[in-house]
């Protein structure tokens, strides 16, 4: 019996070393049941190695990891996890229905149960008209969608998706987003490893930023994207001491002629900044606030050197 009160994913100082290279260093993470969790980092940051350790495809050098409150080696736990890898090679001589039926057999599903589930999933990923085609005839996007159907075949409690929108057109990406939202509504936990930050921004509840194999920040997505504001001010009579005084609201203030760029913690600071400038005799012509995108936050948190 899998305990339902335990986190969907829990790691403690999980570490993987290949020779003299630390791929993942002291990964400590907790993903709650029913949330969509984004795992973000540049190439080479250790994301895929972390996923492989969670799936017991790569053994950790040290540390602990649990899925759904149980051991990674527990067959019952493994049977409640669905996985879509970034790079896959499916049996391309099989038809779409045959491919899913093969995996249904591996899950020991009854014939009637398998047929019903396969029909539902083909409809979910919009592949019903192509169910009789061999996988070698599928486009990259169609293969991605049949892979997603395979990951959901066992109605898992935890779904791990590694770059699920890779190779998809805008319609396909929207379909994947809709599937993820439906999984959330059903209480399924989704662990999303993606470099498409715009997709993460739309779908995730919380995100973790990983760099050099270590988690450097975990935060609710809403507090990230609704928090800081990037503000551009166009004004005259800007004396150096006045510009310096803006540091009480912003840790980053840049002056370029009649333009000031600063970062505020929230909208509540806007009237105070405007009032301060006017009281200092500054002629304010424009004050333009703009939400910082997840991409900009990613660069701020992870840096421009990426995972190298």
Where is each model-derived feature located?
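ABC transporter nucleotide-binding domains
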Residues: 6-11, 16-211, 215-217
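Solvent-exposed amphipathic alpha-helical surface segments
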Residues: 107-110, 280, 305
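Short, charged/small-residue-rich alpha-helical element at the C-terminal edge
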Residues: 230-301, 308
